[in-house]
């Protein structure tokens, strides 16, 4: 906190006083003031409600008919005027998240979602609702993944539920299936990988005729990773089968994303990294070749994903008893995880550290 404050020329209490404050905040004996909340939000990747243990639901306001009709009229014009701006803002937040991590984006993302939820609430006809709901579905999955990365699992789960509802409102099985597939990772991280597998398989059965080949490949790769997390001979076989299916489904078109599904980044290079991750979890010796190939071709702007590659290489070297190489990659994984503030990868780094 002191380093953060010094960099921004903020006046805060001494180190000794801060230790007392932190203890009292944790025990509920002292309220978090606005000044310290502004510092803690980007440091912890938490919302005001999470810091203060409050309900985020706003108090209803007693608005009259004039105000209601004004909001409805404003929302009716949004699909033509504001939706492109919503999409551009989501893309900017996605880029910032990919390169710098999610912890410093909590306020921006919450404000972004609130604006779209407000617009959707007062959009009446399907023609006005669908574009806003589509934008909200994509932004909500991004917000959910950011929350999961920050260790805010309750917020992550609720954001995925918001994304699914928005996708249903948008009549978009693509965004619905993607939200279900990502939500499965919350279950896996919570210790329910078998339930996660069932959810991602259900996502693949959600209007498959309307899913793009890239989305189908993404869901198959997610199933492979989650099956590997369950373990056991049957799930190992299922993981390998799902990997083969992902490889067969992924279009060889040189593209990374679909124009109508911008939430997914997946090409042959990304799938190679994913395959290496799954094979490392299965203890397969061929994981090493896949992972080093992925590392050589990795996009440096995918900072968090590169931390994952180094974690996977650590795991692969540990399986072969190559401790020096494992330590080298673990150190790189730790540096990248700290750079993005990823609680999720920091946790994985600590688990791997315990095996050295």
Language-model-detected regions and their locations in the chain:
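Long, contiguous hydrophobic alpha-helical segments, chiefly transmembrane helices and signal peptides
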Residues: 1, 22-25, 40, 145-146, ...
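Short secondary-structure junction/hinge motifs that connect adjacent elements
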Residues: 1-3, 15-18, 109-111, 130-132
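Short amphipathic recognition helices of helix-turn-helix/homeodomain-type DNA-binding modules
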Residues: 3, 11-77
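Short acidic, glycine/proline-enriched loop segments that cap or flank alpha-helices
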Residues: 10-13, 300-302
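Conserved binding/catalytic microenvironments
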Residues: 78, 83, 90-356
